[in-house]
């Protein structure tokens, strides 16, 4: 069973399940392994959640029209692209020399209570302290690096599903 030959609905369902699994693992790492997320981690989670929503809506809708499938593909690609941008910033913060680090700033909850949304976004993206810590690795890659890998893969998956016409036994 080649997943690239699956129906749009099945491919978008798989994309949703991948995002849900990644978010579940992030919560597991936080609650059971004690790794608190930094503000950039939280923004990456939001990007994965947005991507999951687009995948789920696309899977539930299962449009027959090629144009509608393309819209879902592009929306999902944009959500993944935002996640890639945040992930790239996070990786950059992690690879900077430690002597160039500054504080990541106050917690996100405090920022959101005292600033507008655009100021919070700008402040979080300029934070570097805790965001630069590497507390977890798998196969030599940090969690933000793995997020980048997943965002790239899911972006390509969304475009592949949205821009290829296909009919299969898994259609509905």
Curated annotation (Swiss-Prot):
Residue spans crossing the bilayer: 12-28, 47-63, 71-88, 146-164
InterPro entries assigned to the protein according to its UniProt record, in alphabetical order: DiS_bond_form_DsbB/BdbC, Disulphide_bond_form_DsbB, DsbB, DsbB-like_sf
Cell membrane listed as a keyword: yes
GO MF entry, a single one: electron transfer activity
Topological type in the membrane: Multi-pass membrane protein
Classification via Gene3D superfamilies: DsbB-like (1.20.1550.10)
Keyword set, alphabetical order: Cell inner membrane, Cell membrane, Chaperone, Disulfide bond, Electron transport, Membrane, Oxidoreductase, Redox-active center, Transmembrane, Transmembrane helix, Transport
Location in the cell: Cell inner membrane
GO terms classed as biological process: protein folding
Record topology, Cytoplasmic segments: 1-11, 64-70, 165-172
UniProt topological domain (Periplasmic) ranges: 29-46, 89-145
Pfam families: DsbB
Gene Ontology cellular component terms for the protein in this record: plasma membrane
Domain of life according to the entry: Bacteria
Main location: membrane
Cysteines joined through disulfide linkages: 38-41, 104-131
UniProt function note: Required for disulfide bond formation in some periplasmic proteins. Acts by oxidizing the DsbA protein.
Family: Belongs to the DsbB family.
PANTHER family for the chain: DISULFIDE BOND FORMATION PROTEIN B
HAMAP family the record matches: DsbB
Name of protein: Disulfide bond formation protein B
Protein's organism: Xanthomonas oryzae pv. oryzae (strain KACC10331 / KXO85)
